[in-house]
Amino acid sequence: MVWTYWNLGPDLCEAQAPGKAQRSAFFRRLMQDLAYPAGTSTFWPACLPDSDAMPASPAPAEGEDRSRYQPNADVFWSGVQALHARAVVVMGSVAARALGLPAGVRPLQQLRHRGTLVWVLWDVEFLLDEPQRYAAMLAFVRRALQQISRR
């Protein structure tokens, strides 16, 4: 299973990405709560650095425009195929648009895109700000994972 969210690109590329520590803690908790075996999940970014826009220093300035990260749906979906992922979890509408998912997809929705089962969740930052949604999201993911683990 592949997980992605818009800020995964900055989280992988920038040691001091704003909010990185909170997102990392969120995913550690989520993976622990799901209790799936190691190697079941991987993370693949929905956006990549625009090499022409990357500064010499990897640390972003306060309030820096993050537009130096660009979506590349073709790279993402070819990575999903190369990883032989049985499903993709897309967190947030920005990531969903970046990956070319149909307009109007909503959190806690399942669809097929490019032949792959996709589950759309709320954005990580939204879940951090609205912790009462965590239980609903966790229940949805557990049910969804049962679909692919039976195959």
Model-derived features: positions:
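A polyanion-binding, active-site-adjacent surface
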Residues: 1-151
